[in-house]
Amino acid sequence: MKFIIVLLLFFFFKVIDRVICVTPQKLICLKEDVYLGDFFFFLKRKKYIMYDVNIGEGFNLQKEIFYRLSLVIYNLNKKDKINIYYLVLPPWCYVTHWNIRKGNNLRWEFFFNTDIMKKVIPIIEYEEYEKLYGNYSDIMINSKYILDNYKEKSFLILPFEECNINVNRFKQFCKKCEHKYNVLYSGYCTTINTKQSECYSYNMISNYFITSILENLFLYNITSVLIKQSTNILVPFVNELYQSNLEDILLFNNKLLSYGNNYISNILKTNHYISSHLRYTDFKYISRYNVPPIHIALLKLLYIMFINNCRIIFIASDEKVEIQKVINKDFHQYKKHFYFYNNQNNLHEGEFSIIEQWICTRSYIFIGNIFSRFTMNINWERHLINKGQINQNIDLCSYHINDDNDQDIKNSYKKIVHIFNHKALQKIKNIYDNYSDRDKKYINTICYNFLSHFPNNRSIYRKEYITNT
């Protein structure tokens, strides 16, 4: 009898707690999670889904893959009443744009506010998983697309070797051992040993397909599954993430946001500035998008700045040294308008990049590169802080945007307009008049992005960081 009374009291206080949490002062509790809201979640059997991406993928792509897997985890927990599924966060090791190639093994909390993630889905850092189970998983899976017979409705289960063997660095290393197979994990962080391996071939590798595969696998007595090459999973629609409360759970940690906000407050001293991501090193070789010469890009940024009555241009770039040389040589009289973030605190290059992203995120207008994931992540964040209007997020435009035979790139934009602002042109006249007619037309061409690719709601998690924006 006492046990029943205690149980009833437990439920009573749980209900009271959830009612209190819907007050406006605690908006964060309005997130209707699918595991903390279950009173018996602590009694469920713990299952783990590990994943990684192609070796050497960039930071922003790896960040994006998290959304794909988080939706899988969300749906698994929503359906299952017996098990609770944890997403194992792979450590950050080898990342393409980092100078330090190996030996990082950084936790996600080094960059992100993981407490926010935990409010919606169960997560665990790989370091914690390894303490529990070592570098072992029960089964690893991969996927490949059926390209020759798209109408095929069923999927195929193939030997693991028939998936991308070069990406997986897979080998069978001990036929008589319980964990027979071995594969590289999360760049060059470590290797994972597994008992079984399978390759699934299908014409639509969506998060629903992967969820279904995992549901079937966990019917057996297993604890963990490793998903290799999870970049194969299709990008979810924005509304799928929104309906699952997942679209805004990847927020940078307080330390990095503070660095960015302090720079805006103490150095820029205004929120009315424009920002731009100028990417050059590897984008010089993208035939579909011709990046403009640095001096052309800088004059276009000045033009946009004067049109919008701003006085500051913040630039994030992989060619910062070269850009500053051009400014000193050709734009000396406009030098006071250009700002760059300097790594005075000797931060990790991943941290430095995040701070640049946040400064760009909070700007009045952002000018990016439509093919860059760095740009895409800034635009995503901007839409979450009510800076998603079409005139606030502009693309620099391909240098050949005005060529008649470049219709393909034109179709990548929501709209393209030619703006001739006499007042703004007068302020750059001494340089503008020396450019060719082709370059003048490019400077006057403004490209606008599609808004449907991004969320359209204001994030409650970001509210405290943008009070003055």
Curated annotation (Swiss-Prot):
GDP-beta-L-fucose binds at G56, E57, G58, F59, N60, H277, L278, R279, R373, F374. GO terms for biological process: fucose metabolic process. It is found in: Endoplasmic reticulum. It is an enzyme of class 2 (transferase). It catalyses: L-seryl-[protein] + GDP-beta-L-fucose = 3-O-(alpha-L-fucosyl)-L-seryl-[protein] + GDP + H(+); L-threonyl-[protein] + GDP-beta-L-fucose = 3-O-(alpha-L-fucosyl)-L-threonyl-[protein] + GDP + H(+). Gene3D superfamilies: 3.40.50.11340, 3.40.50.11350. This is GDP-fucose protein O-fucosyltransferase 2.
